[in-house]
Design a protein with these regions (language model features):
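Context-gated lysine
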Residues: 34, 90-92, 99, 131, ...
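Surface-exposed beta-strand edges and their flanking turn/coil or helix-capping segments
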Residues: 1, 26-29, 62-65, 112, ...
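Conserved kinase catalytic-core segment
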Residues: 56-116
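Short, surface-exposed, charge-dense and proline/glycine-enriched linear segments
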Residues: 41-55, 95, 115-127
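Conserved ATP-binding subdomain of kinase catalytic cores across diverse folds
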Residues: 1-61, 82-86, 99-100, 107
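Surface-exposed loop/turn and secondary-structure junction residues enriched for glycine/proline
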Residues: 4, 22-24, 68, 114, ...
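C-terminal catalytic region of ATP-dependent kinase domains
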Residues: 101-208
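Glycine-rich loops and low-complexity Gly/Arg-rich segments
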Residues: 8-11, 38-42, 72-77, 121-122, ...
Length: 208
């Protein structure tokens, strides 16, 4: 779901997909995993997948940002703070470059704070991302500190997360995922309600 929300906020991502894993496929995959020494296994049922992007170049930490890349990095910074994603940092960039610009991937830890509060490290409100302590560890913290995101631009990105859009998105999800989606949706609704406060926090306190 993080992938879909990031895309809605203007972040370039591989296209998300729901993949149905049948029992025979799971058996073949798990046998292969076991042969290779892996200790985990896949389960039959719906799973999240995404488009394979060929020709993506690795991101070099500290490389200069063009105006286009600065805008894309700002959108990604705002999304990662909204979702309290701790997994996009200098040691693990989880993004790359294509001809379209900065592409983000790996969203598995997004919104983890909705289910395991310790992940976020704070009982702060969703519109107070500076209190999560994650901003200073973000991949683009130095760039955002040098050129802070515009509060108006961040507020506009949050404004795309409408209740109507989210309800339509949830209707397309497998039933077994909808409970978690409802919890995430409550966070999105709160962020949209306090979009101005969220945007000002991202543009000021998050980049101190």
């Amino acid at each position: 779901m993080g992938n879909v929300i990031a895309t809605r906020m203007g972040v370039l991502t591989p296209s998300a997909a729901i993949v149905e894993i049948e029992e025979p496929v799971a058996q073949v995959v798990n046998a292969s995993l076991k042969e290779r020494g892996f200790e985990f296994a896949v389960r039959p049922g719906p799973a999240a997948g995404c488009e394979f992007l060929s020709g993506i170049q690795p991101w070099t930490v500290g490389q200069p940002l063009s105006p286009m890349l600065q805008r894309q990095a700002s959108a990604l910074f705002a999304f990662d703070l909204l979702s309290q994603n701790p997994d996009r940092r200098k040691e693990k960039v989880n993004c790359g470059l294509t001809k379209e610009g900065l592409v983000a991937f790996d969203f598995e830890m997004c919104f983890g704070h909705c289910f395991l509060p310790i992940v976020g490290g704070s009982r702060a409100e969703i519109w107070e991302p500076s209190k999560s302590g994650l901003a200073a560890r973000h991949l683009f913290y130095a760039e955002m500190r040098a050129h802070p995101p515009l509060a108006g631009a961040v507020q506009s990105l949050i404004g795309r997360l409408t209740t109507e859009w989210w309800n339509e998105t949830v209707c397309q999800l497998p039933v077994v995922w909808r409970h978690d989606a409802d919890i995430i949706g409550q966070n999105l609704k709160a962020a949209a309600t306090y979009a101005d406060e969220f945007a000002r926090d991202v543009a000021t306190r998050c980049v101190l």
